């Protein structure tokens, strides 16, 4: 079993689509979850469909540990102070192979790339660019 730190780099979004009845630019942000550890990006105020976040988030990892669901879950939202935040879509990144390799050799990386944002698992709502790095500790 290996312990380590996983760093998730949320870089940007492209073509994010949210329903805004007033046609205002969207204010996207992402909620990020890994095995119950939750993080939240900054709101990209008035960024519209192509936000730049360039934020890094750290998660403590125990691999293989308990439970077998090794996915990073992103819930992409549009901040709306007046009538509540609007759901845009989700991204699910499987990191099991990344963690297995990282435990074996000391580190591992998923270079940044675009991932499709899907609403209700089927409706394309744009993309987010994400990279992931894992470093074994001890």
UniProtKB/Swiss-Prot annotation:
Membrane-crossing segments per the record: none
C2 domain residues: 1-108
InterPro entries to which the protein is assigned, alphabetical: C2_dom (IPR000008), C2_domain_sf (IPR035892)
GO MF terms, alphabetically ordered: metal ion binding; RNA binding
Tissue expr: Sieve elements of leaves, stems, roots and flowers.
Residues engaged in binding Ca(2+) 1: 20, 27, 78, 80
Binding site for Ca(2+) 2: 20, 78, 80, 86
Keyword annotations from UniProtKB, A to Z: Calcium, Metal-binding, RNA-binding, Transport
Pfam family, one: C2
Domain of life where this protein originates: Eukaryota
SUPFAM superfamilies: C2 domain (Calcium/lipid-binding domain, CaLB)
Cofactor: Ca(2+)
Protein task: Binds to both sense and antisense RNA. Interacts with mesophyll plasmodesmata to mediate its own cell-to-cell transport and potentiate RNA trafficking.
UniProt protein name: 16 kDa phloem protein 2
Species of provenance: Cucurbita maxima (Pumpkin)
Gene designation per UniProt: PP16-2
